[in-house]
Amino acid sequence: MSCNQQKECCKKECQEKECCKECCCPRIKAFKKFINTFEKAQIGKEAPEFKAPAYCPCGSIKEIDINEYRGKYVVLLFYPLDWTFVCPTEMIGYSELAGQLKEINCEVIGVSVDSVYCHQAWCEADKSKGGVGKLTFPLVSDIKRCISIKYGMLNVEAGIARRGYVIIDDKGKVRYIQMNDDGIGRSTEETIRIVKAIQFSDEHGAVCPLNWKPGKDTIEPTPDGIKKYLTAH
């Protein structure tokens, strides 16, 4: 951003280096003010609604309506951009995981700010050319950034989604929000562990302790329950 686009207070600093500080950049400041007008995703609250075009596993472009996923758990997988570096490893990994998630009534939806045609080209490209090949879940185009804003996943300065995901339960409520630095890939094993923990807690009313996995002990959420668990462990 040039000095002509900055406030007077920033011009001196801009002569030495590019400046994108919120206090000095009117465009970023105005955009952040606009973002604050949106209701953001919150744990335990209804997941923000959206409809958007997506490139689907069948090879066609269709509209995704998050409301149509009621009755299922959803992993809403935000990522920075197609044709990058960590992102393809994650999309391929979650594509392999999608079958296991379907077995427990959970779907994966990828979301980035790329166009559906960029998604299509990425999925049709061979891995030797930086593509991801055919995925088993849809890639939504959030080209207007509205979905990323609603779910608190937009990197405002870069204008792209952050590397994070949101788990929505079968009743349409947000149950888990996680975000990584752009250079750190996620764990598919941790994702499925969290989904199973949410489902177990919903079904049985128990709570899941540190490092819980299916088959491990849970805790009855009462004073006696935690005493019993801590004594046994």
Swiss-Prot record:
This is Putative peroxiredoxin. It catalyses: a hydroperoxide + [thioredoxin]-dithiol = an alcohol + [thioredoxin]-disulfide + H2O. The active site is a conserved redox-active cysteine residue, the peroxidatic cysteine (C(P)), which makes the nucleophilic attack on the peroxide substrate. The peroxide oxidizes the C(P)-SH to cysteine sulfenic acid (C(P)-SOH), which then reacts with another cysteine residue, the resolving cysteine (C(R)), to form a disulfide bridge. The disulfide is subsequently reduced by an appropriate electron donor to complete the catalytic cycle. In this typical 2-Cys peroxiredoxin, C(R) is provided by the other dimeric subunit to form an intersubunit disulfide. GO terms for molecular function: thioredoxin peroxidase activity. Homodimer; disulfide-linked, upon oxidation. Keywords: Antioxidant, Cell membrane, Disulfide bond, Membrane, Oxidoreductase, Peroxidase, Redox-active center. InterPro entries: AhpC/TSA, Peroxiredoxin, Peroxiredoxin_AhpC-typ, Peroxiredoxin_C, Thioredoxin-like_sf, Thioredoxin_domain. It is an enzyme of class 1 (oxidoreductase). Thiol-specific peroxidase that catalyzes the reduction of hydrogen peroxide and organic hydroperoxides to water and alcohols, respectively. Plays a role in cell protection against oxidative stress by detoxifying peroxides and as sensor of hydrogen peroxide-mediated signaling events. Its EC number is 1.11.1.24. It comes from Entamoeba histolytica (strain ATCC 30459 / HM-1:IMSS / ABRM). It comes from the Eukaryota. It is found in: Cell membrane. Residues 41-200 form the Thioredoxin domain. SUPFAM superfamilies: Thioredoxin-like (SSF52833). GO terms for cellular component: cytosol; plasma membrane. GO terms for biological process: cell redox homeostasis; hydrogen peroxide catabolic process; response to oxidative stress. Belongs to the peroxiredoxin family. AhpC/Prx1 subfamily. It is a peripheral membrane protein.
